[in-house]
A protein has these predicted regions:
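Short, well-structured N-terminal submotif of metal-dependent ribonuclease cores
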Residues: 1-70
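Acidic, PIN/NYN-like endoribonuclease modules and their adjacent C-terminal/linker elements
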Residues: 3, 121-122, 133-169
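Alpha-helix capping/helix-boundary segments
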Residues: 10, 43, 82, 131-132, ...
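General small-molecule cofactor/ligand-binding pocket signal
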Residues: 38, 76, 166
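Active-site neighborhoods of divalent-metal-dependent phosphate/nucleic-acid chemistry enzymes
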Residues: 49, 74-146
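Short, hinge-like loop/turn segments at secondary-structure boundaries
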Residues: 55-58, 93, 161-164
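Short, mixed-charge aromatic SLiMs
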Residues: 70-74, 159
């Protein structure tokens, strides 16, 4: 598969015609429009969550954003093939950025001890960003984001298929 995968920050601005950077993302995407542009189910969930908790956004604007979301047809779900790139990214992030006192602690054999409780704050990466990046790697898509995602990009260079990022501003 080829094309682009929109990160939450890109999709939310694309679907909000009143956002000050809406025109910028539209122009950016028009310049790459010969390739398919995909969206992750995680991005849809993050935006819907945001709409539900932001009380200052008027109902009409929320409806406009939801209508734009509904028009987007190229949606990627998580599946068993997302597991490998996700776990590879998360493991590399853990090895590189977890606090030293956490790195040697997973030596027991009880299943409940194998669950990693290292937080996004400790790794410097949001959990959903790892999932979205994993989908981009899984499908060989270029991730369109406003974030640098420097830690994810850095550790992905050790993987068979590193993350490709197209940053827009």
């Amino acid at each position: 598969m080829d094309g682009y995968l929109l990160d939450t920050n890109a999709a939310s601005i694309l679907w909000d015609a009143r956002h000050r950077d809406h025109r910028k993302i539209k122009i950016f995407l028009e310049n790459i429009s010969s390739s398919p542009i995909w969206i992750s189910i995680i991005v849809l969930a993050e935006i819907e969550y945001g709409l539900k908790i932001v009380p200052r956004l008027d109902v009409g604007r929320q409806d406009d954003i939801r209508n734009e979301m509904a028009k987007f047809l190229l949606i990627l779900a998580l599946d068993k093939h997302t597991v490998a790139p996700y776990s590879d990214l998360r493991a590399e992030l853990f090895k590189k950025y977890a606090p030293k006192d956490r790195k040697g602690r997973l030596t027991t054999r009880r299943p409940e001890d194998l669950v990693d409780r290292t937080t996004a704050k400790e790794l410097g990466v949001q959990e959903n960003d790892i999932w979205i990046a994993a989908q981009a790697i899984q499908y060989n898509l270029i991730l369109v984001t406003r974030d640098r995602m420097s830690r994810i990009a850095e550790v992905s260079t050790t993987l068979t298929y590193p993350l490709q990022i197209a940053a827009w501003k």
